[in-house]
Curated annotation (Swiss-Prot):
Subcellular location, principal: cytoplasm
EC number, as in UniProt: 2.3.1.181
One matching Pfam family: LplA-B_cat
Annotated catalytic residues: C169
UniProt pathway annotation: Protein modification; protein lipoylation via endogenous pathway; protein N(6)-(lipoyl)lysine from octanoyl-[acyl-carrier-protein]: step 1/2
Source organism of this protein record: Citrobacter koseri (strain ATCC BAA-895 / CDC 4225-83 / SGSC4696)
Function: Catalyzes the transfer of endogenously produced octanoic acid from octanoyl-acyl-carrier-protein onto the lipoyl domains of lipoate-dependent enzymes. Lipoyl-ACP can also act as a substrate although octanoyl-ACP is likely to be the physiological substrate.
Superkingdom assignment: Bacteria
Protein name: Octanoyltransferase
Residues binding substrate: R71, G72, G73, Q74, V75, T76, Y77, H78, S138, L139, G140, G151, L152, A153
HAMAP family reported in the protein's UniProt record: LipB
Annotated site residues (Lowers pKa of active site Cys) in this chain: K135
Compartment(s) where it occurs, according to its Swiss-Prot or TrEMBL record: Cytoplasm
The keyword Secreted appears for this protein: no
Length: 213
């Protein structure tokens, strides 16, 4: 069935705001026949403040812009070397609940890291994926008219120092991690295809097609 197909866009390195705007336009204009999409992207340095975000968690942004976002959660950082995956899914059509989608995204990351010998886990008290006590992946979603947007951000081989300018996801002193601390060969180029393969597997391997950005 055509509607089961997922279209995949690889967007490369992009500013946050135009991609966010395009994601909103896609979600606002889609109907029950619109195929789902997954967008793979890296962003230029930016702090994004989620709907629950409190200004006091942005400690000293300095030269990095702070942008308000309508995803769930608190403040986080995006930058080159972090793989972002936006999931634009019709949850009703795929018979997925919001909590199920969160669990599916967390498991996608856990499975991707396990392929590289990294033992990661979600936490009941703080969304995302962790290696030990350190956070390696942030999650933030929004649901509109039964469709998801926003998604996850997995730290691959990025500079983690900007996270010190914020309380990541509202947790003071939350330590961040990246895949390259365990695997020097990790890049967004080789992690993105595995993230995609693992989420598709958890969605029961629907047909998918890469489309030009």
């Amino acid at each position: 069935m055509y509607q089961d197909k997922i279209l995949v866009r690889q967007l490369g390195l992009q500013p946050y705001e135009p991609v966010s705007q395009a994601m909103h336009e896609f979600t606002d204009t889609r109907d029950e026949n619109t195929p789902d999409e997954i967008w793979l992207v890296e962003h230029f340095p930016v702090f994004t403040q989620g709907q629950a975000g409190k200004a006091e968690h942005v400690l000293m942004p300095g030269d990095i812009p702070v942008i308000q976002s309508d995803r769930g959660g608190q403040v986080t950082y995006h930058g080159p070397g972090q793989q972002v995956m936006y999931v634009l899914l019709n949850l009703k059509r795929r018979k997925l609940g919001v909590r199920e989608l969160v669990t599916l995204l967390e498991q996608t990351v856990v499975n991707t890291l396990a392929e590289r010998g990294i033992d990661a886990h979600p936490r009941a008290d703080a969304p995302g994926v962790y290696v030990g006590e350190k956070k390696i992946c942030s999650l933030g979603l929004r649901i509109r008219r039964g469709c998801s947007f926003h998604g996850l951000a997995l730290n691959v081989n990025m500079d983690l120092s900007p996270f010190l300018r914020i309380n990541p996801c509202g947790y003071a002193g939350m330590e961040m991690a990246k895949i390259s601390q365990w695997d020097n060969n990790a890049t967004t180029d080789n992690i993105a295809p595995r993230l995609l393969a693992n989420i598709l597997a958890l969605l029961n391997n629907p047909p998918h097609e890469y489309i030009p950005a």
